[in-house]
Amino acid sequence: MNKMLNILLHTDEEDRWAITCKNAETILKMAEMGNYTVNLEIVANSFAVKSLSADSFASTLKLKDTLIALQDKGVNIYCCSESMNFLEIDSSMILPFVKVVPSGVFHIALRQHEGFAYIKP
């Protein structure tokens, strides 16, 4: 019988994406080895949102490929609309596989209330 884990990874700095993605990959690997079903989310807010914009394509090509691979494994990736507004990033510029939520911190609070484990690499 599979055991269920709900995990949320939070990143708010552009330079934390690599470790956040590595943590996601490790969680998926360990879950598979331990016969766990994982509901894994990555929530980006503040300046980390900049890396999810098509405008930052040149600097984040590897990140984009990594996030697509994670999404293909069932990871949901969320971006904060409040941060987008603050940074003047239009929603049409966000990578198409990223889901926009009204508030990243509120989304995190809701998930914690629902029992998600919170990890900020």
Predicted feature locations:
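Histidine-anchored nucleotide/phosphate-binding helix
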Residues: 19-35
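Short, well-structured secondary-structure segments
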Residues: 37-41, 48-51
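A cross-taxonomic marker for long C-terminal extensions/tails that follow the last structured domain
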Residues: 53-121
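Extreme N-terminal starter segment of soluble prokaryotic enzymes
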Residues: 3-7
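Short internal beta-strands
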Residues: 40-45, 78-81
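Solvent-exposed loop/turn segments at secondary-structure junctions
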Residues: 14-15, 47-50, 83-86
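Short helix-terminating capping/connector loops at secondary-structure junctions
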Residues: 2, 34-38
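Short, glycine-rich nucleotide/cofactor-binding loops
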Residues: 8-21, 54-55
